[in-house]
Amino acid sequence: MNAIHGSFTPPHLLNNRHSPTRNIYPSSAMTGRKRKADDDGSSDDRMSASPSISSAELPRQQPRHMKRMRTNLSGRPLPLPRLLETLSADEMRNLLQSICQRHPDIGNEVVSTAPRPSIQSTLEVLSKYESAFQSAFPFGGRASSDYAYNRVRQQLIELLESLKDFTPHYLPPNEQQSATSLAFLDGATEIIHRLPNWDTYQHNRHKEEAYEEMAKAWAIVFREAAKKAGGIQLQYGGWDQKIAKHNEHSGGKMQEAVNELRGGLGWMGADAPAPAASGPEDAMSIRQQLLSGNYGMGSSASIGAW
């Protein structure tokens, strides 16, 4: 039997034979369809199906504008501007006064650079002293009794001392405007009018001395105002009526100021026309009484509401 023997080539000597090319990647069409199918699902489904960690475990990035706490934080005193913000007006005043007393040069600088107090602010301070004085009166009993005087004596002295300190500030030459000086004196004199008349005569010396000092202050301002523009401010300011009212209310203790004003307006006396007499009951005007020196004599002057 004939046998056919074929020749075989060893495998390693064979030419490289590649198997048919197979596309291991899905076709573009299938890829598009797969992506579209994935897109149709909700994001929640994809997230739930994903094996990734939950959002709570993900580190969150802090906003960039937030400041990080200092790692070297330690206790320290407040900066001066922050400390001053926490002080009340009384605490600030006491602190500044204490510093100025220990360092006179600082006190002089404060006096020279501080704004000038206004009439309103000054009268408000005096009003606080007056309110403290009124609040110190005991309940019940007579307000003019010795017991009441002993209860309010300290507050009374503080009120009168504040008047003595503030009044020179509004007098010339420190205050050049006569209108400003007179306006302050008008308000300060009203405070003295409201002080009680005590049963014991010796207790009234505080009020008597206050009237004397206030009368001198009025006289100084009248004297200086008469030198400016011929005293025209005194003529048209109505101060003749106001000082006459104060003198009447004080029981004649402002007479020195009345006399000074009379002298300042004396240059007008010769040219002043006589008032028209509409009847025997008509009294002379206050200005005419001041010029003639007859104020308070005879019938009382009609000054109207003031």
UniProtKB/Swiss-Prot annotation:
What InterPro entries would the database entry show?
A: Cut8/Sts1_fam, Cut8/Sts1_sf
Region named Disordered = 1-64
Alphabetical UniProt keywords: Cytoplasm, Nucleus, Protein transport, Transport
What cellular component terms from Gene Ontology apply here? Answer: cytoplasm; nucleus
Comp. bias (Polar residues): 16-30
Sequence ranges of Basic and acidic residues compositional bias: 36-47
Protein purpose: Involved in ubiquitin-mediated protein degradation. Regulatory factor in the ubiquitin/proteasome pathway that controls the turnover of proteasome substrates. Targets proteasomes to the nucleus and facilitates the degradation of nuclear proteins.
User: Member of which family?
Assistant: Belongs to the cut8/STS1 family.
Protein's UniProt name? Tethering factor for nuclear proteasome STS1
Q: Please report the organism this UniProt entry assigns to the protein.
A: Phaeosphaeria nodorum (strain SN15 / ATCC MYA-4574 / FGSC 10173)
In the UniProt record, the gene name given for this protein reads: STS1
